[in-house]
Amino acid sequence: MNFFDVLEEMLVILFAIAAGYVANHLGYLGGETDQKLSKLILNITMPAMIVAAVITGEELPEISVILSILEVGVVFYVLEFALVLTVPKLLPGTAGERGVYRYTLAFPNVGFIGYPVAVALYGDGALFYAAILALPFNLLSYSLGPLMLAGAARFRWRQLLSPCIVASVLGLVLALTRLRPPAIVGEMLDFVGDITVPLSLLVVGSLLAHMSPGKVLRSPKLWVLSVLRLLVMPALLCLVLRGMHIEAMVLGIAVSQMGMPVAVNGTLLSMEYGGDTEVMAQVTFLTTLGAIITIPVLAAVLL
């Protein structure tokens, strides 16, 4: 694992957010454009990326390895949801803000940032492991995520049939059955899915364009959430998994994924379903900024 490889990945991501910020001030992004891009990502490019991540690997691991990764995923989310059920009650805020607190603790950025970080730490073979670990994230974030952010009153059962959830179920079935569609299918999905990450980061940057950085940096609540998200939660997961004697590579990938900043999807889902988009964008910015330091440190110290 290379400290500077991980640092470079984080700087690339921060640059994309900065580009979205500038694009908004130049009039290229903002308002209706951001909303349409959000719909494009959630309904077309993201589902393509989810399935492509599972079917484009060179070689599928044994089913026992896949089940082991999913077992780690269960521990991963049990730990997260234990904090989701307790921490937001201790922090002051509106119902919308508490929804953001819950989403922040529940859903790290295991895809957009997690995939390249896993590859930087463990090589190309780590991508499939990271993709399998991300499948529970995809299922939960697109079903429970809107419920957390917008509340039960705005939840609709048809949200469970969103393209991202359908793609996640399909990806899980393909992984467990070891079915592989023709290579051209993977190439097509990968080609479309590849625009997901830069587009999403541009939208986040655009949403931050009219936000006061000082307001974010002076918010104790956002700092508490950021420290929990970036440092405390990965440290706890590392202790638990080491006690379970999990394979070193799986443990390392899981701990690094737990230490990711909050998922960019939260901002997109807030826009789509009526959550507190401003606070969601603020905590996304702060955790992503902090992760430039904490992720390389996690790689060097915990793993």
Residue ranges: model-predicted function:
Residues 1-303:
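Alpha-helical transmembrane segments of multi-pass small-molecule/ion transporters
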